[in-house]
């Protein structure tokens, strides 16, 4: 997908950069692959101490071709490998827009399960019931991502 497909309303970027091919999106610099857009998001809370802008250099070294960052962010990467820098006053919201365009197929229904005990069990039972009924479903939580033909264990718990 071209950068211009992700942000048709933001034509204030260099015309040459508009045609940059984007092969993926991530806000984790460790997951950047060549052709990715890296979202250098600021810390969600004042006390978290993590700021995505601190990892821009790493993302570029891993092959990021575009950087999404808060207004006022500058990136010093001279040469042919300089990424396209997109700034926005609300980069989290902009990343959500990009993701909805990049990952076009969205589920019709999303169901959340809350509570203190039994969430994973309820999710598992519900998936089994829907499977018997011929419905496609997936479960994402502390036990990882579980979907037909795809199984990924937990990564952040």
Language model regions located:
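Phosphate-binding loop of NTP-binding sites
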Residues: 93-157
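N-terminal leader/targeting and accessory segments in enzymes
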Residues: 1-97
């Amino acid at each position: 997908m071209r950068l211009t497909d992700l942000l048709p309303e933001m034509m204030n970027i260099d015309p040459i950069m508009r045609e940059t091919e984007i092969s993926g999106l991530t806000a984790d610099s460790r997951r950047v692959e060549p052709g990715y857009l890296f979202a250098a998001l600021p810390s969600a809370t004042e006390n978290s101490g993590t700021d995505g802008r601190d990892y821009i250099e790493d993302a570029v070294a891993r092959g990021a071709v575009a950087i999404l960052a808060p207004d006022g962010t500058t990136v010093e990467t001279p040469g042919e490998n300089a990424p396209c820098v997109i700034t926005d006053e609300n980069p989290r919201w902009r990343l959500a827009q990009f993701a909805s365009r990049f990952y076009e197929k969205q589920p019709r229904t999303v169901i959340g399960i809350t509570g203190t005990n039994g969430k994973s069990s309820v999710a598992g039972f519900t998936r089994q019931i829907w499977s018997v009924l011929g419905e496609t479903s997936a479960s994402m939580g502390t036990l990882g991502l579980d979907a037909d033909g795809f199984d990924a264990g937990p990564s952040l718990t």
